[in-house]
Amino acid sequence: MTKKILLLLCKGFEVMEFTPFVDVMGWAREDDNNEDKADIQVVTCGLYNKMVTSTFGVKVQVDVLLGEVVKSLDEFDALAIPGGFENYSFYEEAYSEDVSQLIRDFDSKGKHIASVCVAALALGKSGILKGRNATTYRNSLREHSVRQQQLRDFGANVIADQSIVIDKNVITSYNPQTAPYVAFELLSRLSDENKAKKVKTLMGF
């Protein structure tokens, strides 16, 4: 049975946090053992433009716009959101009501939500992290994390020194390096732990 991930790209997203979802699920589909393949489709989604410009200027053409799929969200099993840079206008879209409503829709149905780095702040803005464990970007060169404090201000219980935090259906992480591991965790949830371990080994992790 095919599973589907809606991979939301907000303006100013980080490429390093986007590509692991595509690669990990692609490797899962291409397993040499036909009986062991995980049929997980990744559908890239933009808010308002089919061509989304990332942090540092890489442009990605998405499969769909949110307005085109908003009435068919029941087809999707998970939502994934990479983070991005404030000075590349990431929060303009990530904090929009359209994104907040999308996040609330997935959470209300108990569907998996995977965020990388500061994308957790979009989850916080939506209200779904109040009273829940989560994390977000932590600058190891500074004593205090501005982003983690912002997440606290949204009502989250921030686990400051844990790279990936899972609370029920929600996965959050604290820097770009965690992106592949968030993708592996999502694969484990959409298929099984053994499949995720196998793909991780095949990819050299």
Curated annotation (Swiss-Prot):
Q: Does the keyword Nucleus apply?
A: no
One GO term of the cellular component aspect?
A: cytoplasm
The alphabetical list of record keywords is: Chaperone
- The answer to whether keyword Transport applies is no
Task: Report any Pfam family annotated for this entry.
Answer: DJ-1_PfpI
**InterPro entries, sorted:** Class_I_gatase-like, DJ-1/PfpI, Prot/Nucl_acid_deglycase
Alphabetical GO biological process terms: positive regulation of phagocytosis; sorocarp morphogenesis
Q: What does this protein do?
A: Protects cells against oxidative stress and cell death.
The family assignment reads:
Belongs to the peptidase C56 family.
Q: What is this protein called?
A: Protein DJ-1 homolog
Organism, scientific name: Dictyostelium discoideum (Social amoeba)
- Which classification does the entry list for the species? Eukaryota, Amoebozoa, Evosea, Eumycetozoa, Dictyostelia
